[in-house]
């Protein structure tokens, strides 16, 4: 059995780490490199970086800080933000990223997934999915351009259908960003995760809602996800990654200990 992964998420805007609630009202957390060093020291398995306004601004992620991150850590990291071509992805990987993630650009052009997978291998291609539960319809819907409140909109894709589509096109890993739970710290949406797990045959990462160590345990034990991503509980030092891993190991979760 592969070890479960603990993954801090760093939303980046204008060269700084920020964090919002339900993808809105972002506050500045601090500089990228100091947080990166702290998470690596605490025992993070990998890191994910989202340049949250890149797609909405029609630009690609700033590569200068990617090189800075690669210089100071030796754990894998994934970068997302406005990647719309094979050439752009290759450049980001050349600066030191281990994986690239696409979200809104994949919705705009689903063939991008297969082109990237063909060029770099499926193990390198992550698709992020921003999913919102619409109480009126009772459905989970995929959202696009969520880094810009003025441009965020619901797409025609229902989440489970998009899950299957991106796998057909070559996604090697999925990150499910559960927008209703984001930043609220009331736990992951286990019902949605279980539904997605039934359709998802590649590694699945849960994102949105972690507030306690027990929430991570529930995601691993009850939804069988491969990794758990979180931001605010790590940024604000509510949970220490090393202590979280000790807790999970004591509960029988296969996890890499420092």
Swiss-Prot record:
Gene3D superfamilies, per database record:
Aldolase class I (3.20.20.70)
Q: Where is the active site?
A: 11, 130
What would you give as a GO molecular function for this chain, any one? lyase activity
Record's keyword annotation contains Iron: no
**Main localization, broad class:** cytoplasm
Q: Which Pfam families match?
A: His_biosynth
Keyword field: Amino-acid biosynthesis, Cytoplasm, Histidine biosynthesis, Lyase
Task: State the EC number(s).
Answer: 4.3.2.10
GO cellular component entries: cytoplasm
State the reactions this protein catalyses. Answer: 5-[(5-phospho-1-deoxy-D-ribulos-1-ylimino)methylamino]-1-(5-phospho-beta-D-ribosyl)imidazole-4-carboxamide + L-glutamine = D-erythro-1-(imidazol-4-yl)glycerol 3-phosphate + 5-amino-1-(5-phospho-beta-D-ribosyl)imidazole-4-carboxamide + L-glutamate + H(+)
| SUPFAM superfamilies with a match to the protein in the record | Ribulose-phoshate binding barrel
Source superkingdom: Bacteria
Return the similarity comment.
Belongs to the HisA/HisF family.
Q: Which HAMAP family match?
A: HisF (MF_01013)
Q: How does it assemble?
A: Heterodimer of HisH and HisF.
Its job: IGPS catalyzes the conversion of PRFAR and glutamine to IGP, AICAR and glutamate. The HisF subunit catalyzes the cyclization activity that produces IGP and AICAR from PRFAR using the ammonia provided by the HisH subunit.
Name by which UniProt lists this protein: Imidazole glycerol phosphate synthase subunit HisF
Q: What is the lineage of its organism?
A: Bacteria, Pseudomonadati, Pseudomonadota, Gammaproteobacteria, Enterobacterales
Gene name, Swiss-Prot/TrEMBL: hisF
């Amino acid at each position: 059995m592969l070890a479960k992964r603990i993954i801090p998420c760093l939303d980046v805007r204008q060269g700084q780490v920020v964090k919002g609630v339900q993808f809105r009202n972002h506050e500045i957390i601090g500089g990228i490199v100091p947080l990166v060093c702290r998470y690596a020291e605490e025992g993070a398995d990998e890191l994910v970086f989202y340049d949250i306004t890149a797609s909405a601004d029609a630009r690609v992620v700033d590569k200068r800080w990617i090189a800075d991150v690669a210089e100071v850590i030796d754990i894998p990291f994934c970068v997302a933000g406005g990647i719309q071509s094979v050439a752009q992805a290759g450049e980001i990987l050349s600066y030191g990223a281990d994986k690239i993630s696409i979200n809104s650009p994949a919705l705009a052009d689903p063939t991008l997934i297969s082109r990237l997978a063909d060029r770099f291998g499926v193990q390198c291609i992550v698709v992020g999915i921003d999913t919102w539960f619409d109480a009126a319809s009772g459905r989970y819907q995929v959202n696009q351009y969520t880094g810009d409140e003025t441009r965020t909109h619901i797409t025609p894709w229902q989440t489970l259908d998009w899950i299957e589509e991106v796998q057909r096109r070559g996604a090697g890993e999925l990150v499910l960003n559960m927008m209703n739970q984001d930043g609220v710290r009331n736990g992951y949406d286990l019902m949605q995760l279980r539904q997605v797990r039934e359709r998802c045959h590649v590694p699945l990462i849960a994102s949105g809602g972690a507030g306690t160590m027990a929430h991570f345990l529930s995601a691993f034990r009850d939804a069988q996800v491969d990794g758990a991503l979180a931001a605010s509980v790590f940024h604000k030092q509510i949970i220490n990654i090393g202590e979280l891993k000790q807790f999970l190991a004591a509960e029988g979760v296969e996890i890499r200990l420092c």
